[in-house]
Swiss-Prot record:
Present with 2540 molecules/cell in log phase SD medium. It is found in: Nucleus; Cytoplasm. This is Non-structural maintenance of chromosome element 3. It holds the Pfam family MAGE. GO terms for biological process: chromatin looping; DNA repair; double-strand break repair via homologous recombination; regulation of telomere maintenance. One of its GO terms (cellular component) is chromosome, telomeric region.
Length: 303
């Protein structure tokens, strides 16, 4: 039997197993709908207590005994991964994320442990659908083209109801706000990464000014939010971690590090691809890229 036949048999076995779960575990079905809905609307971290509460409520509605969390976690992920291409991943303790912060490379090569699975206290929904560069490029080009059409005499008219909705980014695979948000987020994360995972608040703001992001309290165009409020939002979503220290000379000193969500969503390999794209490097030019990045990002992927 060929390896292709073996792979087909494995896929069929997995499909049958997932179909059995979908059929026999109504609580898992409801949990998957809840998790996907929450991920779509809030893009937030989900606590273990919240998941247990929803599981308990779903079990009560189905008039069945409350199942174990570990079994539910396994069945939920089986459906998420095999049907939708997602994974519910446990996050490491937040206390570990606050350790360090001196910008040294002492922990750079300390790899992150295996995912905590059902034992974690907080979880994040990850998209495991294989990356398609051509499709992503198409979305970006389409979004950028549509955005340009919303600039009239130097003014953005996307928020003007009178302009209609037939040609908005939302109707063309993306939204203008989403495009800007992801762009600013990428800039902020790269600044923190390549400041060896330790940057002062004032330094971050200065860097962002060079990208045209206002620091005078005025709102960022399209996002309609100040940079201070955006940073607070990124803290809340745990893309970055805020550290506060008391100094006899400078008073309160605020700095930032990479957060758990970024570690989970943007792994080292993804960061390498991002740098490769930004720098326009061909494959043969990336031989030393991994080592160069490791030297530059401090303990960003340590815990």
């Amino acid at each position: 039997m060929s390896s292709i036949d073996n792979d087909s048999d494995v896929d069929l076995t997995e499909d049958l197993a997932v179909a059995k779960i979908v059929k026999e575990n109504p609580v898992a079905r409801k949990m998957v709908r809840y998790i996907l809905s929450r991920g779509e609307s809030q893009n937030s971290i989900i606590t273990r207590n919240k998941l247990q509460s929803v599981i308990h409520e779903a079990a009560r509605e189905e008039n069945i005994a409350k199942p174990s969390f570990s079994k539910m976690f396994m069945d939920i992920n089986a459906i998420l991964y095999n049907v939708y291409g997602f994974e519910l991943q446990g996050l490491p303790s937040k206390n570990n994320m606050n350790a360090g912060g001196n910008g040294s490379n002492s922990n750079t090569n300390k790899s992150m442990p295996e995912p905590l699975g059902h034992r974690a206290q907080k979880f994040i929904l990850l998209n495991n659908v294989p990356h398609s560069k051509n499709f992503d490029d198409f979305k970006i080009l389409q979004s950028a083209h549509t955005y340009e059409e919303l600039i009239v005499t130097g003014e953005y008219i996307g928020d003007d109801i009178a302009s209609g909705t037939s040609n908005t980014l939302e109707s063309k695979l993306s939204t203008d706000r989403d495009l800007v948000y992801k762009g600013v987020l990428s800039v902020i994360l790269c600044i923190v990464f390549f400041s060896k995972n330790n940057i002062l608040h004032q330094e971050l703001i200065k860097f962002l000014e060079t990208f045209g992001i206002p620091s005078d309290g005025s709102k960022i165009a399209i996002l309609n939010i100040t940079i201070e409020d955006l940073i607070k939002s990124l803290e809340k979503r745990e893309y970055i971690v805020r550290l506060e220290e008391k100094s006899d000379t400078d008073g309160e000193v605020i700095s930032y590090r990479i957060g758990r969500r970024t570690q989970a969503e943007l792994g080292l390999e993804s960061l390498e691809k991002l740098v490769q794209e930004i720098m326009g490097l061909e494959k043969e030019q990336t031989k030393s890229l991994h080592d160069d990045i490791i030297k530059s990002i401090g303990d960003s992927y340590s815990i």
